[in-house]
């Protein structure tokens, strides 16, 4: 079985590229089915396994396939599928892609789950996102034995690393960085009005950090008004005035807000240049801070050219969250050591799994030989032959049949193959214990 991780992340590509490769969560199962069919069409034997992890900072395809030439086939087929599915020219995607086979794929999965490959070193949100990706693949019926085992081991390693190191102790989250960036423009958050667009985990986390500064008021604009109202109610319970808006209300109310934080799964921008220009006129060009945590982006990038708008993307926040790196270095080294050991364990498991078909074939062949000799012995006993002679003949027959294949291979081999067999056969037939004396 061959493993492969092919992807793109914040290390290899800017947000302008990453947003073109990101998958809409609503269509992820459909994409997984399409990927499997594409891999099947690439001359794969058996059913390929697949999982897609798509977040604001990375899009990764994890694959497993049972084929002697699977490594090259998996890379070519998966890259071709990704480029075609996201309607990108291969030449524009290739410079940003990484392709990790076998143990490199395992190591990468472990590092991602532990937060070692994140923009925020040690952050925990990625682990939940990986679990969601695995759940989606399982629901789609494309997870399979090998990837399921890989991710179960991945989650166990992440738990071990977080429990035995201080990997997340000194990290600064995206939410905290959003507050700090806003405070560069507005000294007191308590005097500002804040708009959150979206109501998912990221916005909920951001709201927690901003609400701690007791802003003047807060509004939640979300696709489903009920979810937005739930978040608004939880904010109101903290003595901060909050309300829920429909997305359709944004053009008429955008000018009311000083700080706007957005993180949705929309495939198209929610806030356009014209909408912001109109809002600035109504504000008489009072500054606005806009923080875009979405991939694909929720704000049209042209907005950044406006003089009175401070637009930040996830890549911009990356500069702030690098603080604390030196303090985390010892924990990172400890985590890497744990991961390296667990990679070896998983690869040993994979090698054992690869031997299962051979073991089953040998066991089935042994059973056929046993049954054949047993039937012959039973017939002789039915004829009244001497039981001692029958037992001796059955034992001799089993011995000859079990040794025939190995001796035949040795006698008809030469060169390096013969040398290898001479070293191997004694190990195969070595006794594991001395016979007991009776």
From Swiss-Prot:
InterPro entries for the chain: 4pyrrol_synth_GluRdtase, 4pyrrol_synth_GluRdtase_dimer, 4pyrrol_synth_GluRdtase_N, GluRdtase_CS, GluRdtase_dimer_dom_sf, GluRdtase_N_sf, NAD(P)-bd_dom_sf, Shikm_DH/Glu-tRNA_Rdtase
Q: Which residues bind NADP(+)?
A: 198-203
Tell me a GO biological process for this protein.
Answer: protoporphyrinogen IX biosynthetic process from glutamate
Which SUPFAM superfamilies does the record associate with it? Glutamyl tRNA-reductase catalytic, N-terminal domain (SSF69742), Glutamyl tRNA-reductase dimerization domain (SSF69075), NAD(P)-binding Rossmann-fold domains (SSF51735)
Enzyme Commission number: 1.2.1.70
Keyword Protein biosynthesis recorded: no
What the protein does comes down to:
Catalyzes the NADPH-dependent reduction of glutamyl-tRNA(Glu) to glutamate 1-semialdehyde (GSA).
Report the domain remarks.
Answer: Possesses an unusual extended V-shaped dimeric structure with each monomer consisting of three distinct domains arranged along a curved 'spinal' alpha-helix. The N-terminal catalytic domain specifically recognizes the glutamate moiety of the substrate. The second domain is the NADPH-binding domain, and the third C-terminal domain is responsible for dimerization.
Protein name per UniProt: Glutamyl-tRNA reductase
Miscellaneous field: During catalysis, the active site Cys acts as a nucleophile attacking the alpha-carbonyl group of tRNA-bound glutamate with the formation of a thioester intermediate between enzyme and glutamate, and the concomitant release of tRNA(Glu). The thioester intermediate is finally reduced by direct hydride transfer from NADPH, to form the product GSA.
- Which residues does the annotation list for site: Important for activity? 108
Quick one: which pathway?
Porphyrin-containing compound metabolism; protoporphyrin-IX biosynthesis; 5-aminolevulinate from L-glutamyl-tRNA(Glu): step 1/2
Its quaternary organisation is:
Homodimer.
Which EC class is this protein assigned? oxidoreductase
Q: Which reaction does it catalyse?
A: (S)-4-amino-5-oxopentanoate + tRNA(Glu) + NADP(+) = L-glutamyl-tRNA(Glu) + NADPH + H(+)
Q: Which organism is it from?
A: Polynucleobacter asymbioticus (strain DSM 18221 / CIP 109841 / QLW-P1DMWA-1)
Q: Which gene encodes it?
A: hemA
């Amino acid at each position: 079985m061959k493993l492969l991780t092919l992807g793109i992340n914040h290390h290899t590509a800017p947000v302008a590229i990453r947003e073109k490769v990101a998958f809409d969560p609503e269509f992820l199962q459909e994409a997984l089915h399409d990927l499997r069919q594409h891999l099947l069409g690439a001359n794969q034997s058996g059913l390929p396994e697949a999982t897609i992890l798509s977040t604001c900072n990375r899009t990764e395809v994890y694959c497993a396939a049972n084929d002697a030439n699977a490594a090259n086939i998996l890379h070519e087929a998966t890259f071709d599928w990704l480029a075609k599915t996201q309607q990108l020219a291969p030449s524009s995607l290739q410079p940003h892609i990484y392709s990790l086979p076998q143990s490199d794929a395992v190591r990468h999965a472990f590092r991602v789950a532990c937060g070692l490959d994140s923009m925020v070193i040690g952050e925990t949100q990625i682990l939940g996102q990986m679990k969601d990706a695995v759940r989606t693949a399982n629901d789609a019926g494309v997870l399979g034995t090998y990837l399921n085992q890989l991710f179960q081991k991945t989650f166990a390693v992440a738990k071990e690393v977080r429990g035995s190191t201080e990997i997340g102790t000194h990290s600064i989250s995206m939410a905290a960085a959003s507050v700090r960036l806003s405070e560069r423009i507005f000294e007191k958050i308590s005097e500002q009005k804040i708009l959150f667009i979206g109501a998912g985990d990221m916005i909920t986390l951001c709201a927690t950090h901003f609400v701690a500064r007791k802003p003047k008021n807060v509004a939640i604009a979300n696709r489903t008004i009920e979810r937005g109202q739930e978040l608004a109610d939880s904010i109101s319970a903290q003595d901060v005035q909050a309300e829920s808006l429909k997305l359709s209300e944004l053009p008429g109310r955008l000018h009311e807000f000083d700080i706007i934080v957005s993180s949705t799964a929309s495939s198209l921008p929610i806030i356009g240049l014209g909408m912001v220009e109109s809002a600035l006129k109504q504000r008489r060009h009072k500054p606005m801070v806009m923080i875009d945590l979405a991939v694909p982006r929720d704000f049209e990038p042209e907005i950044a050219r406006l003089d009175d708008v401070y637009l930040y993307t996830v890549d911009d926040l990356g500069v702030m969250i690098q603080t604390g790196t030196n303090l985390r270095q010892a924990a990172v080294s400890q985590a890497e050591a744990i991961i390296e050991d667990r990679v070896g364990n998983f690869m040993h498991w994979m090698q054992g799994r690869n031997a299962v078909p051979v073991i089953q074939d040998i066991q089935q062949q042994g059973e056929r030989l046993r049954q054949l000799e047993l039937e012959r012995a039973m017939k002789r006993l039915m004829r009244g032959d001497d039981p001692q002679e029958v037992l001796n003949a059955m034992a001799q027959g089993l011995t000859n049949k079990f040794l025939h294949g190995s001796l035949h291979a040795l006698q008809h081999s030469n060169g390096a193959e013969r040398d290898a067999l001479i070293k191997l056969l004694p190990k195969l037939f070595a006794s594991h214990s001395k016979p007991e004396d009776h």
